[in-house]
């Protein structure tokens, strides 16, 4: 049987052993017991007091001890063995090598990394495998956070609301469709706003007061023609009782006239042109003979005779000439 001992000694921790004696060279003999010396046997001689000798021995501290015993049947461990290691995932085998293993987060079980001769190599294998798992976990997390940009954006259905509006003649029930903007990925609100503004500039609309008087209108690209409803206009005039407007009858048709002079007749159908300046100027030339007979002080507009040709397609002056209609309505 072959046995060997492995010891680990810490030189920083030293124990001191003190050895105390009277004669470090003393031996066991009969002469040491003799207390009488000389010719006179009765004379006693006092022995000298013994000296005290102190000897110190310094011994280092033993931290751990391994004792292995080998025989024909195999190796058996004798004493306590340390199987754990200072590195995570590394364990020491009974025969002195180090095993490394790591937990697989995807399969929920341990993965064997192998056996290494040194503790550092086993720890390095553990860290390498841990980095691989961390990279795979990061990629999986990024895939979950990705959004599919190829899918169309969702658009809510428009909501309809009934609104009752009061006008000068009658109550109008309108169904208003609330515009819902699209939402989701890839939607830009700036482009939507620019499209709405450009559409408003391309399609001119009448004011609400003119639309209520003359009814629905057909909107064209360049001109807006308003169909004149004589019966509805007569009812409005009768309700407000204008002093300078009266109803005249010529044959079976009903026309409008003004109390200025003996005779003044206005055609039954009037056309209002808002965007074509040339047509409006031609209409004014047709009315010049009638305007000469009118007393302009009866009208709230003083610049009717001062109207000229439009410059640079600016028709803002036309809005001023129709303000008297809104005023009396």
Swiss-Prot record:
The keyword Transcription applies. Residues 86-143 bind DNA. PROSITE patterns: AP2_ERF. It is found in: Nucleus. Keywords: Activator, DNA-binding, Ethylene signaling pathway, Nucleus, Transcription, Transcription regulation. Gene3D superfamilies: AP2/ERF domain. SUPFAM superfamilies: DNA-binding domain. The keyword Nucleus applies. One of its GO terms (biological process) is ethylene-activated signaling pathway. Residues 71-86 have a biased composition (Polar residues). InterPro entries: AP2/ERF_dom, AP2/ERF_dom_sf, AP2/ERF_ERF_subfamily, DNA-bd_dom_sf. GO terms for molecular function: DNA binding; DNA-binding transcription factor activity. Residues 25-51, 71-90 are annotated as: Disordered. PANTHER family: ETHYLENE-RESPONSIVE TRANSCRIPTION FACTOR ERF118-LIKE, SHN SHINE , DNA BINDING / TRANSCRIPTION FACTOR. This is Ethylene-responsive transcription factor ERF117.
């Amino acid at each position: 049987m072959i046995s060997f001992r492995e010891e680990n000694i810490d030189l920083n921790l030293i124990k001191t052993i003190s050895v105390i004696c009277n004669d470090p060279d003393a031996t066991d003999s009969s002469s040491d017991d003799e207390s009488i010396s000389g010719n006179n046997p009765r004379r006693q001689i006092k022995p000298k007091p013994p000296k005290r000798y102190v000897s110190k021995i310094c011994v280092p501290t033993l931290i751990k001890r391994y004792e292995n015993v080998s025989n024909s049947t195999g190796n058996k461990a004798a004493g306590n063995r340390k199987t754990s290691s200072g590195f995570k995932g590394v364990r020491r085998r009974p025969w002195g090598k180090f095993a490394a293993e790591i937990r697989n987060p995807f399969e929920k079980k341990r993965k064997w990394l192998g056996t290494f001769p040194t503790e550092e190599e086993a720890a390095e294998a553990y860290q390498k495998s841990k980095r691989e798992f961390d990279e795979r976990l990061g990629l999986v997390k990024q895939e979950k956070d990705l959004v599919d940009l190829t899918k169309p954006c969702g658009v809510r259905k428009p909501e309809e609301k009934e609104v009752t509006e009061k006008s000068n003649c009658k109550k109008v029930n309108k169904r208003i469709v609330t515009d819902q903007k699209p939402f989701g990925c890839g939607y830009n609100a700036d482009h939507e706003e620019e499209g709405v503004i450009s559409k408003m500039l391309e399609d001119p609309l009448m004011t609400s007061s003119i639309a209520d008087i003359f009814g629905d209108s057909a909107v064209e690209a360049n001109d807006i023609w308003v169909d004149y409803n004589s019966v509805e206009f007569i009812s409005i005039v009768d309700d407000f009782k204008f002093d300078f407007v009266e109803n005249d009858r010529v044959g079976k048709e009903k026309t409008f006239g003004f109390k200025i002079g003996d005779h003044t007749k206005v055609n039954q159908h009037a056309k209002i042109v808002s965007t074509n300046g040339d047509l409006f100027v031609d209409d004014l030339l047709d009315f010049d003979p009638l305007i000469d007979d009118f007393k302009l002080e009866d009208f709230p507009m003083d610049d009717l005779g001062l109207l000229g040709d439009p410059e640079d397609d600016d028709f803002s002056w036309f809005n001023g000439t129709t303000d008297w209609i809104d005023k009396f309505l």
